[in-house]
């Protein structure tokens, strides 16, 4: 859900004949994010201990991030600029690569092709390799459809 390989821990404790369920988790994440499978929610627990960066927010329907990014790139390239996108090395970098692949393969910026993309982070490059190595375990249906067509979702021509 939240990150590649993330998980929650469920524990059942019995004390004085009473059983209770305790759940430990990091941020669970949102549905409909690219690449990795949607989170599996735990339906009930007696106690929950968790971290949540955005726990107090309701997320609406997300925009088409590839289209939004293409607009920013077009504006930047039109002005003769370069775009630097800071991103967490696990998760966000791979999502950005996914969106950039879509921009290139869906011809959203043909007038500026070819444009170069650099990932200037050894950790992000290593994490991207790990994503690719564990695609069958963690990628969602949309990403697997691309893989089955011979397309790597987080790289591009």
PLM feature segments, named:
Residues 1-95, 101-112:
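His/Asp/Glu-rich metal-coordinating catalytic cores
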């Amino acid at each position: 859900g939240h990150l590649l390989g993330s998980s929650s821990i469920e524990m059942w404790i019995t004390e004085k004949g009473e059983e209770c369920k305790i759940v430990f988790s990091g941020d669970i994440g949102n549905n409909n994010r690219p690449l990795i499978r949607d989170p599996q929610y735990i339906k009930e627990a007696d106690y929950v201990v968790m971290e949540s960066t955005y726990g107090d927010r309701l997320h609406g329907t997300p925009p088409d991030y590839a289209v939004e990014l293409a607009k920013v790139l077009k504006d930047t390239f039109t002005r003769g600029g370069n775009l630097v996108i800071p991103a967490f090395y696990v998760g966000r970098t791979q999502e950005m690569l996914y969106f950039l692949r879509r921009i290139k393969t869906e011809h959203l910026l043909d007038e500026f092709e070819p444009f170069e993309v650099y990932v200037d982070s050894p950790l992000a490059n290593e994490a991207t390799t790990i994503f690719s190595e564990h695609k069958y375990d963690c990628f969602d249906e949309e990403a697997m459809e691309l893989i089955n067509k011979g397309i790597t979702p987080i790289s591009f021509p």
